[in-house]
Amino acid sequence: MAKVIGIDLGTTNSCVAVMEGTTPKVIENAEGARTTPSIVAFTDDGERLVGQPAKRQSVTNPERTFFAIKRLIGRTYDDPMTKKDMGLVPYKIIRASNGDAWVEADGKQYSPSQISAFILQKMKETAEAYLGQPVSQAVITVPAYFNDAQRQATKDAGKIAGLEVLRIINEPTAAALAYGLDKKGAGVIAVYDLGGGTFDVSILEIGDGVFEVKSTNGDTFLGGEDFDVRLVEYLADEFKKENGIDLKKDKLALQRLKEAAEKAKIELSSATQTEINLPYITADATGPKHLTLKLTRAKFEALVDDLIQKTVEPCRKALKDAGLTAGEINEVVLVGGMTRMPKVQEVVKSFFGKEPHKGVNPDEVVAIGAAVQAGVLQGDVKDVLLLDVTPLSLGIETLGGVFTRLIDRNTTIPTKKSQVFSTAEDNQTAVTIRVFQGEREMAADNKLLGQFDLVGIPGAPRGVPQIEVTFDIDANGIVNVTAKDKATNKEQQIRIQASGGLSEGDIDKMVKDAEVHAAEDKKRRELVDARNQAEAMVHSAEKSLTEFAGKVSDADKSALEAAIASVKGVLEGEDVEAIKARSNDLAQASMKLGEAMYKAGAEAGPQEGGGAEKDDVIDADFKEVGPDDKKKSA
């Protein structure tokens, strides 16, 4: 039976593992190493190098050596994080025809999925050489905070590499699987995962083979690469002070600085001081220049302290979302190479109030967890159930631009949720479903994932048609949205495509803005709610005036018309209290009209309210499609 492999596709290094019976095994590559640098290079004669061979020649070939490509996967060219990356890497990042960020070497363009596929192919070949048989299926890990576009792009990379990706699994969850596989008893663990390019924290409850993620948070543009950049900038600045030459303008020198910075960073995890020695780093009219500098651990920690502190807030949010305190965490598991740094361990210990668990290899534990999940899918690993979550809320835009959530963040996946909405106008025959993701109260402040139309709705008074909107998130965290007219059973659906995915900048902005603007959001939500209620009352009152025009006195009619005009007069304003007050006046006038009608005694029986709105139906901000297929605003 063919084996399913587990792959940790990392920013800096990648790793592959497989289950041997009930035991996961990390597979060594052709160079004899258990991890492979996530680097792809193209030589002068067009040869493609992957892993250690690519890394070895990076200093002399910086413009055709692609590293940290994971930071670009699933991102658009205009993404702020892409712009940031452009200033950090020596290779060329370009705008693809679809607006995505791609890379270029020797006039050839490559998508990040393609470059990632070359790394995955190396992992595949490593596994095949060890197993002695072809491998066609894999479980691949991604940061827990990866968005839909990034997950889709990772699946694409697997497909390009010739792998059927059976499951996309979150890295902290994979680490928890590896950690908890042979543990007895129940407990709550926090997985602190600071890798080469991303940071994640997940809170999980483990017991009796069940791994349930309670919450997750993170930053997909924070990791070891940023620590390297800080050190490179420091070295370049020190060299400029001493020699008056800016090494930042020399790509070859920058690549040597990066290599030296990475080496120094690693050495300072075990030593308190290291020496950086780069002879012939550059030259000027006076001759060759050399860079020699002693770097202490304390100085390095000072350079990157703010980066380490940036990991604390996501930890705090994850605990809050899980409804737990730091004291309720039984164990903190460290994942990712950067967690070897003593200062990182110190910050983790300070926040959680306990010594972090160091019993797992931070470079290998994610791949091991992926192999365990592969074993579960293949049936080799029994009695293990994994329950993961979606990192952000999902919903649609409804009347007044409000974001109506169907699925809240940190909901266990796979999940499916339906809600019934209705039309905003009489005789509306089509609606536009606009799908958003985020945490803000107003749809416009969140990320538009996509939109689609549901047409052919039978004409009816507003509020009568029933449109069922269903969100379906699969175990990979990939979203499907369906809308169905319950009267005709007509249905439309959209699968959120990679081009419509979220950027990391968007995710961070959504969550941070949600906190900063919480009060503002609440005020705007109250205003929209008040307007919606007022407009509904105006609609109802005007309808009553039309239907019972000949059955009420001129005085009652004038009073109601005045109340309607009064409400309309404040609707465009921003004063919530004024809208509520005028709406209350209109409600009183409507009641008096009703009382007057009953006192007068209606000749006919009870009137049929053909367009009565149902309490459990939410008005949606949809658009009407006329006979000429041109949409009008609702």
Swiss-Prot record:
Gene3D superfamilies xref list: 1.20.1270.10, 3.30.420.40, Actin, Chain A, domain 4, Substrate Binding Domain Of DNAk, Chain A, domain 1
Organism listed in the record: Methylocella silvestris (strain DSM 15510 / CIP 108128 / LMG 27833 / NCIMB 13906 / BL2)
Biased composition (Basic and acidic residues): 611-634
PROSITE patterns found in the cross-reference section: HSP70_1, HSP70_2, HSP70_3
Modification Phosphothreonine occurs at: T198
Induction or repression: By stress conditions e.g. heat shock.
Family of the protein in this entry: Belongs to the heat shock protein 70 family.
Domain of life per record: Bacteria
GO molecular function, one term: unfolded protein binding
Sorted UniProt keywords: ATP-binding, Chaperone, Nucleotide-binding, Phosphoprotein, Stress response
Record region (Disordered): 600-634
Function in brief: Acts as a chaperone.
Protein name: Chaperone protein DnaK
